[in-house]
Amino acid sequence: MLKNASSPLPWFKALADETRLRLVRILARHELSVGEIVAALGMGQSRISRHLGILVGCGLLTSRREGAWTFYSTPGDGAHKAFLGALAPWLDAAGPEADLTAVAAVLRERRQETRRFFNAIAPDWATLRREVLGELDPGELVRAVMPETVALAADLGCGPGELLPVLAERATSVIGVDSSPSMLALAERRTAGLPVGVRMGELEHLPMADG
């Protein structure tokens, strides 16, 4: 039993609507921006935003700002997560299968857009990094926390591979993963002759065996 639990009445009221049930169903699976939700459900932005506001207001959704975008998802802990977990068997049937198919298409487009973006900026990566990080040296930060010897190290989202040689100083084997072919080509050239392998993949589906 949850201690000091507040009344669940606002939660039940919020879910007494088909659109909000559909929103919770898809956002329990994936964190999405407003634009992505609009594209997946085929509804107007004002309508979606109103329902999102109600769900965030009662705590059944959380929002996270990233630049110009706001992303929504269900809570990762606490009473609200426990409540939605108890309803999970019914939430699974709270919307058409087409919603999940549309969300999968939206996520594919997100990955493709990310890949196009990083392919485009790959040649100018060093300049962009200096503009963002200034004199900060990520390699020195890695050296400060990395053990003296490790069997395997991985850089997920390795970009052009600037940290891969640093990892190879102390790791017997190093793997760099990125979704951009242009970035991986730069990483491969940078690490020629080192015990480093580069692989194309998404963070959600890493090209690495468990364990």
Residue ranges of predicted features:
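N-terminal helix-turn-helix DNA-binding core of bacterial DNA-binding proteins
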Residues: 2-47, 68-78, 141
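Short, hydrophobic-biased segments on the C-terminal half of alpha helices
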Residues: 52-53
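Beta-hairpin "wing" of winged helix-turn-helix
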Residues: 57-66, 73
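Class I SAM-dependent methyltransferase Rossmann-like catalytic core
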Residues: 122-132
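Conserved alpha-helix/loop element of class I SAM-dependent methyltransferases that forms part
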Residues: 132-151
